[in-house]
Amino acid sequence: MKFDLLKKDTDTRARAATLTTDHGVIETPIFMPVGTVGTVKGVHQRELKNDINPDVILANTYHLFLRPQIDILEKAGGLHKFMNWDRNILTDSGGYQVYSLSANRKIKEEGVKFKSHIDGTMHTFTPENVMEIQRSIGADIIMAFDECTPYPCDYNYAKRSMHMTHRWLDRCINHLEKTPLKYEHSQAFFPIVQGSTYKDLRRQSAEYIANAGAIGNAIGGLSVGEPAEEMYAMTDVVCELLPEDKPRYLMGVGTPINILENIALGIDMFDCVMPTRNARNGMLFTAYGSINIKNQKWKDDFSPIDEMGITFVDTEYSKAYLKHLFSVNELLGKQIATIHNLGFYLWLTRQARKHILAGDFGTWKAMMVKQMDNRL
């Protein structure tokens, strides 16, 4: 993978760059739609590629390990071929999903023993087998195995967990070097900064991760319930220490405003289930604020869903029609809302890139944050 830093904003730490992999160019800042089990929920690959048009999507190691299982993916020739996707894929390591199981997992130095949420069977993830699983999935960007701590988190626990994540990172790197590629494209490996909401721990972790010398770096353990200001403070501390000449990925973030604020702090890559999950519940994001399409006020509003027309659904359907689809629990309503929200998120990060390159990102961001902080 090759990272080219094209321009840095003069008023903030925002950057415009490109990542080049064997599956194409990723223009940053970028939002990555979440395709947990090998699909972005409710979206055909044709719509995803032609209308939403992301350079990269995310898939989940934990879920793909359980279903369809790794032998099926290997027989298919990897996830790209299995899901008929010829652009970039990033896989997370399963650390966050294991964290979210809480009552059904046991964390030890060796790894994590957990109970499947599907059938109750017991499995173990270690730094070594997670690297092997991600080789078999075949994503372009793969993540280190880490422990994601909850919020709030006791300082001593956060410190012990961070050091274990660092030891796991060393094991990931050692094993990855011994594990050959399974397919005809290369894979880039990103370690993950942890440390909960403690600045000293975040600094320690960022220094350790920076010294690992990986091709890119990620920040984990945020967007787990902490206030936005704490998230920004941790991102700020970490971005001061991570190398400028490598991409920075903030995992699991966030709202449109979160994304713009973190771009200003120096983040290049984002993923989050919010645009798809909220869409399925009738919440739409727009440049002028959010819309709860289930509200009665939209029942006779025949204006387009979004007059900006970012994706085809925005001008083909009215708010009244979409409200009707949700009222009768029609699946099409969830699909329309999902395409709209993902299209908006991709538009937002592309606009951020455009304004970084133009040199007026700070002014544009301030306007957009104020404009989007609104319920329509």
Region locations from a protein language model:
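Glycine- and acidic
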Residues: 151-155, 159, 216-222, 331-334
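Short, solvent-exposed loop/turn segments at secondary-structure junctions
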Residues: 33, 63-65, 96-97, 149-150, ...
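Structural signal for hydrophobic packing residues in well-ordered secondary-structure cores
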Residues: 138, 169, 173-176, 180, ...
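A non-catalytic, amphipathic alpha-helix used as a structural packing/dimerization or gating element
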Residues: 129, 133, 137, 160, ...
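Conserved, mostly hydrophobic/aromatic
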Residues: 24, 57, 92, 134, ...
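Glycine-rich phosphate/ribose-binding loops and adjacent secondary-structure elements
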Residues: 175, 179, 184-305
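C-terminal extensions of enzymes
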Residues: 1-20, 26-32, 41-42, 146-153, ...
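Non-catalytic, usually N-terminal nucleic-acid engagement modules in DNA/RNA processing proteins
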Residues: 1-182, 296-299
